[in-house]
């Protein structure tokens, strides 16, 4: 298979757009999304089991049934905190990119 460069593919000699600024923005956005995706999965599950075993059953001496209930509440609160953090970061990232684009 032959390798083609930009000049040979651009027969009309129209300048090709460069996406280097957008690619950096896209990579940063994907890193943020990946971070919050991992956090959304790991934090509630980890808090559920650790709070069930160590806090509710270990420290407070609750029954198995009660500890399930309260650990689920802790996990749901953790999900909402992660979602709120994601919205905050995404909002600030979008407004920062908008301000940088407006100044150009």
Swiss-Prot record:
Gene Ontology biological-process entries: vacuolar proton-transporting V-type ATPase complex assembly
Lumenal side, ranges: 47-68
Keyword Transmembrane helix: yes
Keyword presence, Membrane: yes
Main location: endoplasmic reticulum
Keywords: Cytoplasmic vesicle, Endoplasmic reticulum, Membrane, Transmembrane, Transmembrane helix
Subcellular location field: Endoplasmic reticulum membrane; Endoplasmic reticulum-Golgi intermediate compartment membrane; Cytoplasmic vesicle, COPII-coated vesicle membrane
Membrane topology: Multi-pass membrane protein
GO cellular component: endoplasmic reticulum membrane; endoplasmic reticulum-Golgi intermediate compartment membrane; ER to Golgi transport vesicle membrane
Domain of life the protein comes from: Eukaryota
InterPro entries cross-referenced by the UniProt entry: Vma21
Cytoplasmic domain ranges by topology: 1-25, 90-104
Family statement drawn from the similarity comment of this UniProt entry: Belongs to the VMA21 family.
Record function comment: Required for the assembly of the V0 complex of the vacuolar ATPase (V-ATPase) in the endoplasmic reticulum.
Protein name: Vacuolar ATPase assembly integral membrane protein vma21
Gene field: vma21
């Amino acid at each position: 298979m032959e390798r083609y460069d930009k000049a040979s593919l651009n027969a009309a000699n129209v300048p090709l757009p460069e996406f280097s600024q957008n690619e950096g923005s896209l990579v940063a956005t994907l890193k943020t999304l990946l971070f919050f995706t991992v956090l959304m999965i790991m934090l509630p599950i980890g808090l559920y089991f650790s709070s069930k075993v160590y806090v509710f059953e270990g420290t407070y001496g609750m029954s198995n049934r009660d500890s399930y209930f309260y650990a689920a509440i802790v996990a749901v609160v953790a999900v909402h905190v992660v979602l709120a953090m994601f919205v905050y970061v995404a909002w600030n990232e979008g407004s920062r990119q908008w301000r940088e684009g407006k100044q150009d």
